[in-house]
């Protein structure tokens, strides 16, 4: 078989596919920007008075557009991989592109048959139904693309692992390639999860940053397996050990990325994030997930070879600590997976409705989270002078993240009450004074905005401006929280319903350390990118 010729032909096909998908996505985006309500998808998710930024976010604000975006970004990863290795003669590279092409073909088939975003109506709708008000937030412009960008990078890494099985060997060189593509995918997925958490904190009005919602968990699951994969690959690429760990984690990450789509888009789970309106798509989505998952596991069972010589660990070695890390991540992964899928399976079997909430997840994951922190501290001391700067930065991010969780949980104080202009209340040593109510009309909504002055020991330190918005197109009312923060504290206000003449319900929160959670996530990303940059320099 002439692998160089096959590589050239595959590259041409992959690049052409990406160009055509980019054209299709560009056409859909143009339809949103000009408010072409002859397209059903545009009429359902846009509005003529939306700003161009929100019209852009509306492109992937529904089921059909978000799937097209995912396919486009996966195709972009494939095109980047093809271009980067276009001169390579090793069969690993055309085999990787073949695996990616098969997955893209399956996803495109689903888009064409069940999720076509270009279906038209005649005569056109006079006006659009508007974008879901909960999604009209800056975080939603970047949150879904980053998640799909992360899934795409991780699917490339999994495709490298599957291609190595087809080739017959998963060695250190394959692990290095797999690691190189998993790292940016993991970074993008982490950034997407951080943005989603920030959106939930700013938009949902309950003062929390993580709700253990099924769709939040759907992105967390591949993140957990991908984090374990990066740790496993760090040993496989250097010493060619933990090869089976790396292969299986790559396959599991692929499966969980697809499972996330099944949870979000099938309508099986009810969530503020789930956009599918019926279960018609559930069967083909589940079939797609089952086909790719079973084929990947079957390939592993058929082609995976013995891992080689037995590796013996001595005491608290780096290898032993990484093995402990892998086991802990797998334990947390299993806990989250069971808590997410059990209510779904319970309902599908006709046994009724069941909800698994935050108390289960918090109690079940806490011991393993504490053990992870112990492992990180031990790894720092065991490594001594050999500790690498990227690992130090990433692990510092984990510690800052953990500190943010603890401090925000312990320091949180809240109060619910009714206030009228001129009244005030003191919470956690800070005084909130409801000064006045402003009425505004902006674009696609009207709003009642409360002006709440914030005082610290009689000194005015700022204002909070929570709103009640009414979206005319959807006939829907939304509460818009207002947040003021510094490096340590957050002051959070939500205005609720009118309870009397000039009296309104308010929920007020004061807590510390919330920003450390997202800062810790950014440090983890910085450590990963620094590791990738150093690895690239070493390879050169």
Where do the model's predicted regions map?
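Solvent-exposed, non-transmembrane regions of integral membrane proteins
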Residues: 1-540
């Amino acid at each position: 078989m002439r692998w160089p010729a096959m590589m050239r032909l595959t590259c041409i096909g992959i690049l052409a596919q990406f160009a055509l998908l980019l054209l299709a996505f560009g056409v859909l985006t143009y339809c949103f920007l000009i408010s072409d309500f002859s397209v059903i998808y545009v009429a359902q998710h846009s509005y003529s008075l939306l700003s161009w930024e929100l019209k852009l976010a509306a492109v992937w604000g529904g089921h059909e557009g978000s799937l097209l975006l995912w396919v486009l970004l996966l195709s972009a990863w494939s095109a980047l991989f093809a271009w980067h290795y276009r001169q390579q003669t090793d069969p690993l590279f055309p085999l990787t592109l073949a695996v990616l092409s098969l997955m893209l073909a399956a996803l495109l088939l689903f888009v064409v048959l069940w999720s076509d975003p270009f279906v038209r109506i005649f005569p056109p709708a006079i006006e659009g139904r508007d974008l879901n008000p909960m999604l009209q937030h800056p975080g939603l412009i970047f949150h879904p693309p980053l998640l799909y960008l992360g899934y795409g990078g991780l699917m490339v890494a999994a495709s490298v692992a599957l291609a190595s099985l087809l080739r017959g060997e998963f060695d250190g060189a394959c692990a290095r390639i797999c690691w190189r593509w998993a790292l940016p995918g993991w970074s993008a997925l982490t950034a997407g999860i951080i943005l989603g958490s920030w959106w939930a904190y700013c938009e949902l009005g309950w003062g929390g940053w993580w709700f253990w919602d099924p769709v939040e968990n759907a992105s967390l699951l591949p993140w957990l397996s991908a984090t374990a994969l990066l740790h496993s690959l760090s040993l496989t690429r250097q010493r060619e050990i933990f090869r089976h760990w790396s292969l299986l984690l790559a396959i599991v990450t692929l499966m969980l990325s697809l499972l996330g789509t099944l949870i979000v888009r099938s309508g099986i789970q009810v969530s503020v994030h789930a956009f599918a309106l019926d279960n018609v798509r559930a069967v083909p989505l589940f079939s797609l997930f089952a086909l790719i998952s079973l084929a990947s596991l079957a390939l592993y069972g058929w082609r995976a070879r013995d891992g080689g010589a037995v590796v013996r660990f001595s005491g608290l070695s780096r290898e032993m600590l990484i093995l402990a890390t892998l086991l802990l991540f797998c334990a947390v992964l299993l806990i989250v997976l069971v808590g997410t899928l059990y209510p779904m399976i319970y309902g599908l079997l006709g046994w009724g409705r069941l909800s698994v909430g935050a108390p289960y997840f918090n109690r079940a994951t806490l011991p393993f989270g504490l053990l992870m922190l112990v492992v990180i501290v031990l790894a720092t001391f065991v490594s001594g002078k050999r500790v690498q700067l990227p690992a130090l930065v990433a692990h510092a991010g984990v510690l800052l993240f953990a500190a943010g969780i603890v401090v925000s949980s312990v320091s949180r104080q809240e109060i619910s009450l009714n206030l009228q202009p001129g009244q005030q209340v003191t919470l956690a040593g800070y005084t909130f004074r409801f000064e006045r109510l402003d009425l505004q009309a902006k674009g696609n909504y009207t709003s009642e905005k409360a002006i709440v002055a914030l005082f610290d020991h009689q000194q005015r330190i700022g204002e909070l401006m929570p709103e009640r918005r009414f979206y005319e197109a959807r006939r829907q009312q939304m509460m818009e929280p207002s947040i003021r923060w510094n490096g340590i504290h957050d002051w959070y206000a939500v205005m609720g319903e009118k309870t009397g003449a000039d009296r309104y319900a308010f929920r007020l929160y004061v807590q510390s350390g919330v920003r450390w959670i997202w800062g810790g996530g950014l440090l983890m990303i910085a450590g990963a990118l620094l590791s990738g940059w150093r690895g690239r320099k070493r390879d050169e």
